[in-house]
Amino acid sequence: MTKKVAIVGAGIVGATAAYQLSKKGIDVTVFDAGVGQATKAAAGIICPWLSQRRNKDWYQLVSHGAAYYPQLMDQLREDGVSELPYEQVGAYIFKHTEKQLAKVEEMAVERRVDAPMIGEVRALTPEDVACVIPGWSNPDGALYCSGGGRVDGELLVTLLLEQAEKNGARVAREKVTLEAVGEEVRVRLGGEVQAFDAVVLSSGAWVKELIEPLGYYVDVRPQKGQLIELTVETTEDTSKWPVCMLHGEIDILPFPDGKILVGATHENTQGFDLVPDEELLNGMYEEACASLPSLKNAKRSGVRVGTRAYTSDFLPFFGEVPSTKNAFVASGLGSSGLTSGVWIGECLARMAAGEEVGFSVEKYTPQNYVRKV
């Protein structure tokens, strides 16, 4: 029986795993250096059903993630959490032509058979959108999906770790390294090497530098992401505005009290750089203002910068580290990490606890991405 688990990396995967393991009464220690976490810089739209990505394995994963959110919120509510970080407010996806909208609508209706959480699906004119979001001026039509939601990734991770600590988990804001003793992986913090029944490696793009010293090749690369936090003075209830996925990479996420997030960039050549790029930020801001001119009067209250992890085929992986008996790993979640990450964290918690996962994980095996050299 698993009694003692280490989790290295406290983003969405690690925080979810820590929370679930702590609820099982397992001794959990979380290690996280707290630098560049992708979760804190993620836009936070939970609406995978409208994606036109053709990879069925990816869709299966994000669809499970989206369906898992209400269950996770119920657990936090039972723990006494009142300010929940996730809410189903609906989603708009914008397309240039009616033909493009019709294609997405047909796909959403087809997927709703297996994913009833999608809810109501209908095409809207720009005028329809402006009735919900006053001042909206984007000329594109939109498809509305009532099941779409938004999540504040930073708040979610904070709450999960807080609840895990209340359940007895320990959180160490420290950078650690790994050591292999035969097939067992141990954690080194300073001069001390600690042994655990299970070690969960969930450090995102940093998993490469964590595992490679043990003699592995790791197929993971970093991608820089930036988003803008804005505050708008308005009498409108922005908490009920749907999230908006514009044509291209820009999303607009309304939150309560006039808080608006705009993002995010997808920068493949910046490595682990975390310096805000004003040119890119201003470009995103101008693009958002073209759709919602009231943002021109908004106050920029912050900038979030993080590092996502990608694999060469853009599919996440999670499961046992090859040639070990107690280590589990997850990475490569990319820009949909907030959607898939909660489910991957749940699956890893079950694996680390020695339980049946109840989900077909073979297609996501780390063996395709983490290899002994």
Where are these regions (language model features)?
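Short beta-strand to alpha-helix junction loop
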Residues: 60-63, 97-101, 143-159, 275-280, ...
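A conserved short coil-to-beta-strand element within the FAD-binding core of flavoproteins
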Residues: 171-186
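Beta1/beta-strand and adjacent pyrophosphate-binding region of the FAD-binding site
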Residues: 2-11
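Active-site substrate-recognition segment that forms the wall
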Residues: 16-24, 31-33, 44-45, 82-87, ...
